[in-house]
Amino acid sequence: RAVPGAGLRVPIWLLGSSLFSAQLAGQLGLPYAFASHFAPELLLEALALYRRNFTPSDRLAAPHAMAVLNVFAAETDAEGVRLATSMQQSFARLSTGKPGRLPPPVDDIAAVLTPQQIESARSRLTYSAVGGPETVQKQLSDFIALTQVDELMITGMMFDKAARIRSLEIV
């Protein structure tokens, strides 16, 4: 019984990136978090399925949803776009079976990726907030309006640790 949370009713969430996880969370009456930061194509359908299948439980009376969102915030829109190129390159590498360390950002993504790789990476980053403070704030507000989520979880894989910290400060 050396569990730190024993007897504290620590909230249990179901985190998923599929329709099955959404349906299961709803049926079990659990809060649901969707991994839209890497699996955006099912986000809206998963949230609708979760809410439609929600059964109240002793832990939760109504649906409570969260979505994970990529954020690349910087002082300017151009710098936010540049910071996001690390993830674009990373997704391109994953799609070709060549994962590795997160690459540094580049000024011209078209110089390092093919048009098909750029499109594939952009589709994986559909739900991202990228740019300067005002742009990112609007994109976050638009995302919340679109999804009606109760909470956001933010991630932002950036090559430069200081840029990542600054991005979080901006948000």
Regions found by a protein language model. Name each.
Residues 1, 41-148:
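An alpha-helical appendage that flanks or caps ligand/catalytic pockets
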Residues 1-28, 41-45:
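Internal, glycine-rich beta/alpha segment that forms the wall or movable "lid"
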Residues 18, 38, 71, 158:
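Residue-level signal for short, function-critical loop segments
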Residues 28-31, 146:
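Catalytic domains of carbohydrate-active enzymes, especially glycoside hydrolases
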Residues 144-170:
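Generic C-terminus detector
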